[in-house]
């Protein structure tokens, strides 16, 4: 009997947390042992009442010892999720500031909102490629949120939203914004009209734009009513804040006319256009601003190196070893350097200004000259002897102390050539040979 009394007291003092009834269920043996108890004895050991309100917030996100994984919610209705969000927000306000329970509630609130966003904007099985206004949009797989939609200027939530990027101009937007795009791909303009605006900020005024954005035609004003007008330093036109994000870019006209490479604010469309045009050799400096060579010494050095490389090119084309070593591929990033010496890209001018191009081109020039003059016997055999003094080493047209006849391409010492500039031995010999072969021809 003493053991049974202890067992009853133990069961009354240790409650079952899973028992939701008003009192603890008693073993039949206990009823027989303790047929009745007065209120004074049972009061201290009575089982407390537990109320379990049916709250929407508890539908998969309430805190308990057997909580479900984060992100798993039983609430599948939009109305239930909204009610759960409100209850979670109220709980956050009631909990102690910076407590662990408040932080957990904030995490639950975030997941509830993501779930609601997913229901409002469900993922659709959309195609991987969309072609629109010469844009080639490919579906992105990145879940990063560090992107902004170029159309609506809002964040792209890659975790729950489908978004696309144009492979031609890097235009990024939500899938729901694709049909709202009105501007064609910038790459099409680069392909058909590869030229720069060479006037510095050619402003025409807001009245010429009818006080509307130059791209989307949204009403704008310099007083920011109804929308702020932002000027693009490249086109000189005004844009709204959705089409002009204050991006910075180097302006070609300022670089050519002022040798100024300070980035200026441009519109989104101009930024993409300038980025695609950056490496295109479309600037003929001798025609646009020939005086620039008188004031920028680096340009003169680069022009001389490029002229020398063009003189070296015939040696490499006819040299088997040079073709096997692919020496000319050292300039594959600047293909125009082996085609002409007067066309420049904006990237070339940037690298000249920073000094990077001068260093790299000097190294390439040294490598090319070493192959022709030292490493390759076939290329050495194509050198020249000065026919005026008949002294000295083998000469090459790219040597700094030589001069080349403009008619027959013979190479002489510079001093010898200018002292005998009235006559070229090789030209005289070729003319004499023509007279012998064609006696009736004029000299």
Curated annotation (Swiss-Prot):
Which residue windows does the record flag with biased composition (Basic and acidic residues)?
Answer: 17-30
Region (Disordered) residue spans: 14-49
> Which GO MF terms are attached to this record?
zinc ion binding
Biased composition, class Polar residues, residue ranges: 31-45
Q: Does the keyword Repeat apply?
A: yes
Q: Which SUPFAM superfamilies match?
A: Cysteine-rich domain, Multiheme cytochromes
Report the CDD domains cross-referenced here.
Answer: C1_DEF8 (cd20819)
Question: Which GO terms fall under biological process for this protein?
Answer: lysosome localization; positive regulation of bone resorption; positive regulation of ruffle assembly
Instruction: Please tell me whether the keyword Zinc is annotated for this protein.
Output: yes
Pfam families reported in the protein's UniProt record: C1_1 (PF00130), RH_dom (PF13901)
Keywords (A to Z) from UniProt: Metal-binding, Repeat, Zinc, Zinc-finger
- Residue spans, zinc finger Phorbol-ester/DAG-type: 134-185, 364-424
**Can you tell me which family this protein belongs to?**
Belongs to the DEF8 family.
Q: What does this protein do?
A: Positively regulates lysosome peripheral distribution and ruffled border formation in osteoclasts. Involved in bone resorption.
Q: Which PANTHER family match?
A: DIFFERENTIALLY EXPRESSED IN FDCP 8 HOMOLOG, PLECKSTRIN HOMOLOGY DOMAIN CONTAINING PROTEIN
Name of the protein this chain belongs to:
Differentially expressed in FDCP 8 homolog B
